[in-house]
Amino acid sequence: MKVLSLLYLLTAIPGILSDVQLQESGPGLVKPSQSLSLTCSVTGYSITSGYYWNWIRQFPGNKLEWMGYISYDGSNNYNPSLKNRISITRDTSKNQFFLKLNSVTTEDTATYYCAR
């Protein structure tokens, strides 16, 4: 109960971590069978200090799918449906983390986002 109270408190106080910004970058289009590589640049917070750094995507029609994360300690967790094609890595010196999705098809058509 104390943990939940603390989490609620942290989310309820305006301004906490409000300067954290995540910005995606990468190619706008990738041809079928190629690999998609995206970068997420984080400012205002060190990716090694805490949190899970996620990739999600939104398909046409607005359906969201969580793809996976890399945690502050470098460990990964992936959506089982993507496990054979996805890799999420990081460069702590640049405070960036990366998505690589192999063998893309038209079913991977989506808008890709990074999030914490």
Swiss-Prot record:
<dbReference type="InterPro" id="IPR050199">
    <property type="entry name" value="IgHV"/>
</dbReference>
<dbReference type="InterPro" id="IPR036179">
    <property type="entry name" value="Ig-like_dom_sf"/>
</dbReference>
<keyword id="KW-1015">Disulfide bond</keyword>
<protein>
    <recommendedName>
        <fullName>Ig heavy chain V region 3-6</fullName>
    </recommendedName>
</protein>
<dbReference type="InterPro" id="IPR013106">
    <property type="entry name" value="Ig_V-set"/>
</dbReference>
<keyword id="KW-0391">Immunity</keyword>
<feature type="signal peptide">
    <location>
        <begin position="1"/>
        <end position="18"/>
    </location>
</feature>
<feature type="region of interest" description="Framework-3">
    <location>
        <begin position="85"/>
        <end position="116"/>
    </location>
</feature>
<dbReference type="GO" id="GO:0005886">
    <property type="term" value="C:plasma membrane"/>
</dbReference>
<feature type="region of interest" description="Framework-2">
    <location>
        <begin position="54"/>
        <end position="67"/>
    </location>
</feature>
<dbReference type="GO" id="GO:0005576">
    <property type="term" value="C:extracellular region"/>
</dbReference>
<dbReference type="Pfam" id="PF07686">
    <property type="entry name" value="V-set"/>
</dbReference>
<feature type="disulfide bond">
    <location>
        <begin position="40"/>
        <end position="114"/>
    </location>
</feature>
<dbReference type="GO" id="GO:0002250">
    <property type="term" value="P:adaptive immune response"/>
</dbReference>
<keyword id="KW-0732">Signal</keyword>
<dbReference type="InterPro" id="IPR007110">
    <property type="entry name" value="Ig-like_dom"/>
</dbReference>
<dbReference type="InterPro" id="IPR013783">
    <property type="entry name" value="Ig-like_fold"/>
</dbReference>
<feature type="region of interest" description="Framework-1">
    <location>
        <begin position="19"/>
        <end position="48"/>
    </location>
</feature>
<dbReference type="GO" id="GO:0019814">
    <property type="term" value="C:immunoglobulin complex"/>
</dbReference>
<keyword id="KW-1280">Immunoglobulin</keyword>
<keyword id="KW-1064">Adaptive immunity</keyword>
<feature type="region of interest" description="Complementarity-determining-2">
    <location>
        <begin position="68"/>
        <end position="84"/>
    </location>
</feature>
<feature type="region of interest" description="Complementarity-determining-1">
    <location>
        <begin position="49"/>
        <end position="53"/>
    </location>
</feature>
